[in-house]
A protein has these predicted regions:
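Short, hydrophobic alpha-helix immediately C-terminal to the catalytic nucleophile
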Residues: 5, 112-113
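Glycine-rich phosphate/ribose-binding loops and adjacent secondary-structure elements
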Residues: 89, 96-97
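Phosphate-backbone recognition surface of nucleic-acid-processing proteins
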Residues: 99, 113-203, 221
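Small-residue hinge/turn detector
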Residues: 107-108, 130
Length: 237
């Protein structure tokens, strides 16, 4: 299993690098459009959207200008999707997949992303350590977040890791199921506890609670399924 985890981690890093470069290339293309529109953001957005239809006075020149960038972006997208497909296939080979596939809203790529960032979940002595790794811990009575100075080391916060859980949480809420129900129940509790809070505040607190519960259950399932796997191997031996 260690080899599978190592492969997933490497594919995840490649995927992240490709995705970052994709986004940077898109931003560069948009920057070119803004320059051609003398900094007019509204007009630049129209030009950007017209790069295919050429339905803009400057579209022909702009499209020719950024074509190499767009080609590079397409190559990056293809390679990123290859990494995602390979990582997802490997994630299905992990013993814990038998548990994860029953969780609505969490697919093989989501599992691969968590493992890509956290590694072997069996190395975490408790769920709290995993929460911190994925940006969901409580540090000195406050939620883990991006801070500066000496506190940054203690928080150990990574926006990328937190983003993974944020996206997974969104997917779960949309797909329904046990964890979506848990989110809705917790949201009602938050509304009662903090009647002066905003809807966004209640939503975020309930979603964070649900994401932490998911990680805690994933950690427990990892321990259980890997123990079963080891015992099966002993019997077969």
């Amino acid at each position: 299993m260690n080899e599978i985890i190592s492969e997933i981690k490497e594919l995840h890093r490649k995927r992240v690098d490709f995705h970052r470069t994709e986004k940077a290339t898109t931003l560069r293309i948009k920057a070119v459009c803004r320059r051609l529109c003398d900094g007019d953001k509204t007009e630049a957005e129209k030009l950007y959207k017209a790069l295919d239809s050429l339905n803009h006075p400057q579209a022909l020149y702009a499209a020719d200008y950024v074509e190499p960038m767009r080609q590079a972006k397409n190559v990056l997208e293809v390679e990123r999707k290859k990494c995602e497909k390979q990582a997802g296939k490997l994630a299905k080979q992990l013993p814990v997949w038998s548990w994860v596939e029953g969780v609505r809203g969490v697919g093989p790529l989501a599992l691969a992303q968590i493992i890509g960032e956290a590694g072997d979940l069996g190395n975490y002595p408790n769920p709290a350590k995993l929460w911190k790794r994925m940006g969901l811990a409580v540090i000195n009575g406050e939620r883990q977040r991006k801070v500066s100075g000496a506190a940054a080391l203690e928080h150990g916060y990574s926006p990328e890791r937190r983003s993974i859980m944020f996206v997974i949480g969104d997917s779960i809420i949309k797909c329904g199921g046990y964890y979506a129900d848990l989110y809705r129940a917790r949201k009602q509790i938050e509304e009662t506890k903090l009647p002066e809070g905003t809807k966004a505040h209640h939503h975020n607190r309930a979603k964070r609670y649900m994401e932490k519960k998911l990680l805690r259950d994933l950690w427990a399932a990892w321990k259980a399924t890997n123990k079963e796997n080891v015992e099966t191997e002993k019997v077969e031996a």
